[in-house]
Structure formats: C-alpha cells, structure tokens
C-alpha cells in the first residue's frame, strides 16, 4: 500500500496527521523560536524593519496587517500563505506550513501547534498547505471588540429612533396640526378672535333725553 496515498486519505477524511498524533503522546519535542531563535543577518540594519521581533516567517504590512511565507526545505522557492489581521494568525499559518514541509525538523512559533492544528501530510501540494494554513489562522481569529459592538448597537438604535420620528412627523395628523389646528374647531377660533375686538364706543339713549355728560340712563353697549 502506498504510504503517501494513505496519508492523503487520512488528511482528506479529517483524521489527525501522523505529525500531530506523535506530538500528542509527548515522545519528542519540536524546536520553537524560544528554544532556537532565528538568526539575524549581520551587517547594516535596514532603515525599516518589517520582520516580527518574535514570530518566525511573519512580516508586517501596513496598515496593521501581517503576511507570512515559508521557504521550501531544498530549494529557493517560497510559498506565499497570505495576509492576516494579527501576528498570531500569521504565526499559526507558518507553523502548519513548516510542519507540512519539514516534519520534525520544523522550527515552530508555538509548541502546541502540532496538537491544536490540522496539519497536511508531508509532501502535500502548495494549495493544500495554503488551505490548511488559512484554516489554522481562522481558528485563532480574535473575538470582536465588545466596545465596538456596543457602539454599533447604539448607532443602530439611534438610527431607528430618528426613523420613527420622521415617520410620526409625516403622519397626516401632524400635518393637520401644523396647518392651523383645523380639527372642526374653527368656530371656537372665531369666537376667540371676536373677544379680542374692541367694543363700540358708548352712546346715550335718545329716549332718556340725556346729553353727552348724562350717564344716568341705560346705555346700549352692543348693537347687532
């Protein structure tokens, strides 16, 4: 039976790879960046350093993005793994690719990567490695910030309140109120306006016979 075919079938069926299975029983330990830090080239330092100070195979890409690529064990070709939101996501993607390419000779960013990540078998294609790296990075995506979530909820509530206010303002009832309170009360409005009119001047009743200065008689105040 072909060993490569068996490993490929195990990977496609979702069973743990031999690399991860051996790591579970603790038979051997992997090298990590803490035990074997990567070497830095001697000479003049670049003006703008983009490599992560701790994680291996991780570089910064503005603004606030992290990229990851790995080199093949016996060649100069590099495998691009993608761009990620956090450095830890890129570091996890690196560990998956390093395990798939180098096996136990891989230098990892996290000692628990063989146990926690689904690693493709050694000799897997570049596409399979990229797919596994993307899955590993997505598994370690940080949760959304609670404060941002609360801000979004408040903004949504404010928008709903403004929308309701606009709907109420456009209701026919409010349009009638704005047009002058014309709700069958025009007669009351006319009476109120009539009470504001000055009364007619006072005049003497000719039947009494009084003059201009005689105010003892009855005076007709209103004339209809």
From Swiss-Prot:
InterPro entries: AP2/ERF_dom, AP2/ERF_dom_sf, DNA-bd_dom_sf, DRE1A-I. GO terms for molecular function: DNA binding; DNA-binding transcription factor activity. The keyword Transcription applies. Residues 54-111 bind DNA. Residues 1-46 are annotated as: Disordered. Residues 1-16 have a biased composition (Polar residues). Transcriptional activator that binds specifically to the DNA sequence 5'-[AG]CCGAC-3'. Binding to the C-repeat/DRE element mediates high salinity- and dehydration-inducible transcription. This is Dehydration-responsive element-binding protein 1G. It comes from Oryza sativa subsp. indica.
């Amino acid at each position: 039976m072909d060993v490569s075919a068996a490993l490929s079938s195990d990977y496609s069926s979702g069973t743990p790879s031999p690399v991860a299975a051996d790591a579970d029983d603790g038979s051997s330990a992997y090298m990590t960046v803490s035990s074997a830090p990567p070497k830095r080239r001697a000479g003049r330092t670049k003006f703008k350093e983009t490599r992560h100070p701790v994680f291996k195979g991780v570089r910064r890409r503005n603004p606030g993005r992290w990229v990851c690529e790995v080199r093949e064990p016996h060649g100069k070709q590099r495998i691009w793994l993608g761009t990620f939101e956090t450095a830890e996501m890129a570091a996890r993607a690196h560990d998956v690719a390093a395990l798939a390419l180098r096996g136990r000779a891989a230098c990892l960013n996290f000692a628990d990567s063989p146990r926690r990540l689904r690693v493709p078998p050694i000799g897997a294609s570049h596409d399979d490695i990229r797919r596994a790296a993307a899955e590993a990075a997505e598994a370690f995506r940080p949760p959304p910030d609670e404060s941002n979530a609360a801000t979004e909820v408040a903004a949504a509530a404010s928008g709903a309140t403004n929308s309701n206010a606009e709907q109420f303002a456009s209701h026919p009832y409010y349009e009638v109120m704005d047009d002058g309170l014309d709700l069958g009360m025009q007669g009351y409005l006319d009476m109120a306006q009539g009470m504001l009119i000055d009364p007619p001047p006072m005049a003497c009743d000719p039947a009494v016979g009084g003059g201009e200065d005689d105010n003892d008689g009855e005076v007709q105040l209103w004339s209809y």
